[in-house]
Amino acid sequence: MSTPIFFDLDGTLTDPQQGITRCIQFALEQLQQPVPDAQALTWCIGPPLHQSFVELAGAELAEQCVVLYRQRFARIGLYENQLYEGVPELLSQLRNRGNDLFVASSKPRVFVERILEHFELIQYFSGVYGSELDGRLQDKGELLGHALAMEGIVGSDSVMVGDRHHDALGAV
């Protein structure tokens, strides 16, 4: 049996910087908060969105920021995203070798699925896991635990591929 492989989405399969930073700027602007330039917001790619907005606008405005962010993201931001070169070929090769492939992202699952469909990658994955819009499963460790349980996979028999410390911590 080949090793099941879990991939993060943002920063691993795609470069979401433009969409994420523009949506953060939009949310902050709408609430008349200081708006950092896009480069100063790259640290927000990876961790749960609510957590980033707590740091940017404070706990009292974080939920409003998330709502505004998602309004723009659902219409525009998810398409302000670039597929990394070679990703489709890699996924195809892994599937042809017999690996079961999964996505495990702290981004809401509904958006993950739309992005995978947009880039015609959905066909390579046996399962797609993401957080829920109500905030459940934002923690990468909790999300991976859920995905492993749903798929009947032992964690030590699988691999997590990601780009941030949240991915590494979640896989432990």
Where are these regions (language model features)?
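N-terminal helical cap/lid subdomain that shapes the substrate entry/recognition surface
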Residues: S2-P88
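Short, acidic loop-to-helix structural element flanking the phosphoryl-transfer center
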Residues: R75-V103, R109-E113, Q138-G141, G145
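Short beta-strand immediately N-terminal to the catalytic nucleophile in serine-hydrolase-like folds
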Residues: A104, V161-G162
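Acidic di-acidic motifs
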Residues: P16, G162-D163
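Short helix-capping segments at alpha-helix termini
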Residues: E29-V35, N96-R97, E120-Y124, E151-I153
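Substrate-recognition "cap/lid" segment bordering the active-site pocket of phosphatases
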Residues: R109-V159, H165-V172
